[in-house]
């Protein structure tokens, strides 16, 4: 009887933990998702692209306020009217709070990045969104 009870309890614990892991993985970490799209002045200039990548990677690596970080280029997805893929780079950062995102805006690493790289882009578009429960 003890063995059956232990097995049943173990199964219950494993099942509960799996459900919790599954629920956690459904949603992005962070209250605020900060999505930034960059259009470079000279996207075909390898030297300028390398300079931009060096600056933005330094920003991402030295930023201690973001929970999750992503740097990417347009995906090679199906061309459709609703798909915007004219940008050169996308950076996504998630923050635990509005305060953390505000601190990031004024952080020396962010300001240094802007100063070092602003001459390399012709357009920047930012989309900030607050996480909703799903």
Describe the function of each predicted region.
Residues 62, 120-123:
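Structured helix-beta-strand junction loops
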Residues 102-105, 115-117, 121:
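Short, exposed beta-strand-loop hairpins at the edges of beta-sheets
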Residues 18-92, 96-102, 130-134:
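Short S/T/G/P-rich N-terminal loop/turn motif that feeds into the first structured element of a domain
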Residues 5-13:
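Sec-dependent N-terminal signal peptides
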Residues 107-110, 119-120, 132:
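A short linear boundary/processing microfeature
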Residues 48-55, 109, 113, 117:
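Stable alpha-helical elements in mature extracytoplasmic
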């Amino acid at each position: 009887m003890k063995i059956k009870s232990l097995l049943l309890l173990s199964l219950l614990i494993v099942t509960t933990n799996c459900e919790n892991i599954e629920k956690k993985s459904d949603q992005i970490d962070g209250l605020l998702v900060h999505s930034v799209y960059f259009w470079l002045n000279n996207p075909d200039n390898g030297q300028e692209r390398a300079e931009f990548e060096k600056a933005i990677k330094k920003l991402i690596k030295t930023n201690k306020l973001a929970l999750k970080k992503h740097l990417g280029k347009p995906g090679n997805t199906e061309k459709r009217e609703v798909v915007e893929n004219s940008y050169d780079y996308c950076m996504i950062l998630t923050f635990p709070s509005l305060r953390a995102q505000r601190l990031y805006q004024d952080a020396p690493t962010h300001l240094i990045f802007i100063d070092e790289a602003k001459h390399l882009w012709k357009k920047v578009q930012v989309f900030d969104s607050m996480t909703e429960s799903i």
